[in-house]
Amino acid sequence: LHKKDNDNINGPSLIKVPDWIDNPLGKYYLYFAHHQGKYIRMAYSDKIEGPYTIYEKGTLQLSETTCKTHIASPDVHIDEGSGRIAMYYHGDVEGGQKTFISWSIDGINFLNNVVPKGEFYFRVFKYKDKFYSVAKNKNIDGVIYESDSWDGEFKPLFNLIPNIRHSAVYVKENMLFLFYSCIGDSPESIFLVKINLDSWEAVKVEKILTPKTEYEGGNLPIMKSMPGSSTLRYGRPVKELRDPYIYSEHNKLYMLYSLAGECGIGLAQLYNIGES
């Protein structure tokens, strides 16, 4: 990335490029963002673990949306039925930060829908015949939405998890595995809560990853995490993990996450998730 674009890196979302895309740049497209980004970033690779090559032009541009100063937090899905790729993202508009959806047939060029879908930091999943999303309700808590389709109206159902920042979702049978971090933790780390999707009952909460390595900020002082951009606030790496994203392939589960605050993207393989 150009120096002006690499001072903040966050919000990963990974897909395996579908077979119906001709001449892809690689087998995997990794979308990510800048907290004050003017476009959604993308890198590509032939292996999940990389190395990844930056697609310098980026994908969806701020100028192609109705947002004012930035777009970020991509959440990307393959809609096999329509042969399209859906990208949820958020940006600032009249009334605050909201989530929108854009569509692409190649994973690079996106057409935007100007109708807001809900609050920001959407992570969308499907259960039975409904679509759901977990989003951040300003800096208060999280909110669960329900919709009949990818780009339909998302109606709020209920709130959950005070101070949640960003989340990731994985569904197995009738269980939602919700990964998240929280503003105000010392240090900010990744948690997992299991939720029964038929009763919406939370079953278990556990901390699964905390900053330990140097590249995660593990050698830095413990501080209470704050809202907003870590690099804009501090101008340096901090001891925080944020922005989880879950990717599943060949019975293997991977978690991508923002490390040292918002100074890079890490990848970890998860074990024994959903076995008990």
What positions do the PLM features span?
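Beta-rich carbohydrate-recognition and catalytic domains
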Residues: L1-S73, H77-K239, S248-S276
